[in-house]
Amino acid sequence: LPVDPIDARTFRRKVLLDPNFDPSGLIVARDAGEVVGFCLCLVRRVPLEKVGMEPERGWITAFGVHPRARRQGIGSALMEGALAWFRQTERREVAIAPYTPNYFVPGVDVEAYADGLRWLTERFGFEVVARPLSMDANIVRFDPAPYAEREAALRAAGVRCEPLAPTAIPEFIAFMQAHLPGDWVRHARELLLDAARGHAGYDQILVAWLGEEVVGYCQFDGEHFGPYGVRSDLQGKGIGTVLMVRCLQAMRERGLHHAWVLWTSDETAQRIYARFGFRETRRFAVLRKRW
């Protein structure tokens, strides 16, 4: 995986310490004792918040064969072993690679791994079900001034956007649980746990209030922008725009020069992110196989 390197710390955090990791699902190919290929397979052993166990679904989050060992049938043997493992665990669907909580990338990079993508679709019958993209923006010269009137209009309508105060955590979590995906709840909770330990700041989460009720939020972790969302009945009123502006400005104030989004759709990219200088950096194919 030449464009997706990881270090040992990331491997431990995202693989060995994942609550769903099962050593039998990490299928490894060796040649004379040396690892030349692998396939990481996962099924849920603990439920995901607001989703549950997904008992019919499994995921492949990483797969690779060493360049010098390719075209010897190793990749096919690994994939056949992976599919057999999923059948043994009574799965009826396998996806590459939108697993939460610890996916590496949304799917197969259509440019960097074009041969692998073609191999998966033609040889093993995977179908492309989505083509999300990653985006990056240089925020050094980002100017929040043009959005001041919009924020003032929201305040006049009773909506205020501000950093999350620790005392408002219960209201914030209640909003997240009621209105946003379970994995976003997890993201926010993990950032708050880091803040409680002194490893992050509560001001890395911006919230929108309507009266005494949280109606939207935006967060960042280093240069990673998002997730962010607004209550469905209040979307289209500029709340998300102001949250995004406040969040990007907070990132600049911390000395960050860039912001990146790992996973979004074309519609969201064009409607929201492009307006703030985000540009596509990678394109992925999310794959699925059913039986």
Regions found by a protein language model. Give the residues of each.
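Conserved hydrophobic beta-strand within the GNAT/NAT acetyltransferase core sheet
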Residues: 60, 94-97, 225, 259-263
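Conserved acetyl-CoA-binding loop-helix of GNAT-fold acetyltransferases
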Residues: 65, 71-88, 230, 236-249, ...
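Conserved GNAT-family N-acetyltransferase fold
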Residues: 27, 37-41, 58, 63, ...
